Amino acid sequence: VIGGDECNINEHRFLVALYTSRFRTLFCGGTLINQEWVLTAAHCDRKNFRIKLGIHSKKVPNEDEQTRVPKEKFFCLSSKNYTLWDKDIMLIRLDSPVKNSTHIAPFSLPSSPPSVGSVCRIMGWGRISPTEETYPDVPHCVNINLLEYEMCRVPYPEFGLPATSRTLCAGILEGGKDTCRGDSGGPLICNGQFQGIASWGDDPCAQPHKPAAYTKVFDHLDWIKSIIAGNTDASCPP
């Protein structure tokens, strides 16, 4: 996260970290949505990875830290054919449930869609410099704004984004605050509701008039709830 500060240790109990199998690299974030399920971005998938819950500092473990591996992974249309503007969402079933503890608690799914102009919080262990490979030991948090989708469509003509999509656009038009590499899959929390999953943005991050895109959680609620309920054939909205 660019332009932020260390998150309060109590404000991110639902934030999980995806690590490579030997814990060498924290490569993505995710959100615990109940005791057995994590929501993240499809582009965070890799063959072997582990999920750490209840962590704050990568160097100083919390007593209630937990580690899990994926038991099952679900994608839209159960394929990985996500594009830059569509279906960048992955639902992970943990190999065993986690109990709530001091630093672990799920975040409920949104009850209403977000509105443009909302203040949204982003968080993660991703890069804190737009140009250098500088990663923090603790998650950083910052507030940005939910913008019109057009604001993400216009600055990136090379992506050929469609006129509408199941993507949210968020950032600060003057730049300086943004998610960055390593923050993918983490939550966008608008007015206290979990509304987005960090999907993609410009490189370097946090440039003026180059906001980032977040998968819209609200549009995928039926799919998420169906999968969790055991209907594994559920398909995402078209």
From Swiss-Prot:
The keyword Glycoprotein applies. One of its GO terms (cellular component) is extracellular region. Glycans are attached at residues 81, 100. Expressed by the venom gland. A motif (Cell attachment site) lies at residues 181-183. Its activity is completely inhibited by PMSF, and almost not inhibited by EDTA. This is Alpha-fibrinogenase shedaoenase. The lineage of its organism: Eukaryota, Metazoa, Chordata, Craniata, Vertebrata.
